[in-house]
Swiss-Prot record:
The protein's name: 3-isopropylmalate dehydratase large subunit
GO MF annotations, alphabetized: 3-isopropylmalate dehydratase activity; 4 iron, 4 sulfur cluster binding; metal ion binding
Reaction catalysed by this enzyme: (2R,3S)-3-isopropylmalate = (2S)-2-isopropylmalate
Described purpose of this protein according to its UniProt entry: Catalyzes the isomerization between 2-isopropylmalate and 3-isopropylmalate, via the formation of 2-isopropylmaleate.
Entry-linked PANTHER family: 3-ISOPROPYLMALATE DEHYDRATASE LARGE SUBUNIT 2 (PTHR43822:SF16), HOMOACONITASE, MITOCHONDRIAL-RELATED (PTHR43822)
Similarity comment text for this entry: Belongs to the aconitase/IPM isomerase family. LeuC type 2 subfamily.
Pathway in which the depicted protein is active: Amino-acid biosynthesis; L-leucine biosynthesis; L-leucine from 3-methyl-2-oxobutanoate: step 2/4
Enzyme class: lyase
Assembly: Heterodimer of LeuC and LeuD.
GO terms under biological process: L-leucine biosynthetic process
Species of the source: Desulfovibrio desulfuricans (strain ATCC 27774 / DSM 6949 / MB)
Length: 420
């Protein structure tokens, strides 16, 4: 039968015949991921189920990115649990020190995930890797423990929503805007346990980093996975990021059956923001401009890559952050950090008055390095803006692209780069 991209990848990882959506299949996994928050829970379950050794020490990644550098005793002890497990099991891909970055930027960058892979992670934004053609999805720590022990997991084959994006891409629009527009259109449950499969002329022209940014937020529409076809851009990205040997394109079959098709035309569209307190509360920047803010965060697994840093620097170069705003810039891996140094972007950020920090999730989840106080308002390039997500329950978060975030830092209110 003609298969969607999700069905095609799952078929490659199971001995069962993938014949219909909703079918339960037992699949071999390519990589199992956990972090400093979810790892200890998975480790406890791993030993609790009687497991002794991981199935493959090269196919597990433990990335200490959420509360690191360790912000307090509790977070330090969480890392200790993961570090000791990595030592006991001789895990190859353990990241904590100077090699550590935000997991969903780090793994594709280091070639640990790639096209056609099946990746499970104890983090909801594991779906990021669909940007390079992997079926990647978040799971609870018990399922991750079983995956670490057995190298297998079970999945219900998701139905697929095809998203076609066409038109002329405006200068200031990015993948983040496209994804926010989609979530605004279908809602936070519009793709509940479904795969989002992206295509169209705009997607074809989009950079791989832009695709990763979009796939990252598939879960914000309830998606099981967000998937992009493997093309020449994907192959080039993989070759440049320690994953050579990707020689063939991979896409859905002609005639594949979709539950629904969503068509978007971006011609003439302006940048958008997701207003408090849902990623689906999406409005054009022009409708909320002049909303005063106290903080900007540029980074995270959604928008902390080098293309994002370049966008932010383009806006900030030669300008100053408003005196009433804290602008926090967090390049999401050491590799991105070093590239920022080579290109002079760190100097641009510092001259503008930004606070430049380490590669950490930090403020995204209200962890550290940028917590919001009572009544404070932020523009962030992160992926969630639920009430209290970045601090006080009375604070507010507007989700945006790095271009909009940087412009907002300069003006002191929600603004697009075209306003400068």
């Amino acid at each position: 039968m003609a298969q969607t991209l999700a069905q095609k990848i799952l078929q490659a990882h199971t001995d069962d015949a993938v014949e219909q959506d909703g079918q339960i299949v037992q699949c071999r996994v390519s990589m199992v991921l956990a972090n400093d928050i979810t790892g200890p829970l998975a480790i406890k379950s791993f030993y609790g189920m009687g497991a002794k050794k991981v199935f493959d020490r090269t196919k597990i990644a433990l990335v200490m990115d959420h509360f690191t550098p360790q912000k307090d005793i509790d977070s330090a002890n969480q890392v200790l649990i993961s570090r000791r497990f990595a030592e006991e099991q001789d895990i190859v891909h353990y990241y904590e020190g100077g090699d550590c970055g935000v997991e969903h930027t780090l793994l594709p960058e280091q070639g640990l995930v790639g096209p056609g892979d099946l990746v499970i992670g104890a983090d909801s934004h594991t779906c990021t890797y669909g940007g390079i053609g992997a079926f990647a999805t978040g799971m609870g720590s018990t399922d991750i423990a079983a995956g670490m022990a057995l190298g297998e997991t079970w999945l219900k084959v998701p139905s697929t929503i095809r998203v076609n994006i066409s038109g002329d891409m405006p200068r200031w629009l990015r993948g983040k805007d496209l994804m926010l527009m989609l979530i605004g259109a279908i809602g936070v449950d519009g793709a509940l346990y479904k795969a989002l499969e992206f295509g169209g002329s705009v997607v074809d022209a989009l950079s791989v980093e832009g695709r990763l940014s979009m796939a990252n937020m598939a879960i914000e529409a309830g998606g099981k996975a967000g998937l992009f076809a493997v093309d020449a851009k994907t192959r080039t990205y993989c070759a440049e990021h320690k994953r050579p040997g990707v020689l063939e394109n991979m896409a859905a079959d002609s005639g594949a059956v979709y539950e629904r098709v969503v068509d978007m035309n971006v011609t003439g569209k302006e940048p958008v923001v997701a207003c408090p307190h849902l990623p689906s509360n999406v409005k054009p920047v022009s409708e909320v401009r002049d909303t005063a803010i106290q903080q900007v965060v540029i980074g995270s697994c959604t928008n902390g890559r080098i293309s994002d840093m370049r966008d932010a620097a383009e806006v900030l170069r030669g300008r100053k952050v408003d005196k009433g705003v804290r602008c926090i810039v967090l390049p999401s891996t050491p590799t991105v950090w070093k590239q920022c140094l080579r290109e002079g972007l760190i100097e641009v950020f510092m001259e503008a008055g930004c606070i430049v920090g380490p590669s950490t999730c930090g403020p995204c989840l209200g962890g550290h390095m940028g917590i919001l106080g009572d009544g404070e308002r932020a523009v962030a390039t992160t992926n969630r803006n639920f009430r209290g997500r970045m601090g006080s329950l009375s604070s507010e978060v507007y989700l945006a692209s790095p271009l909009v975030a940087a412009a907002s830092a300069v003006t002191g209110y929600v603004a697009g780069p075209d306003q400068l």
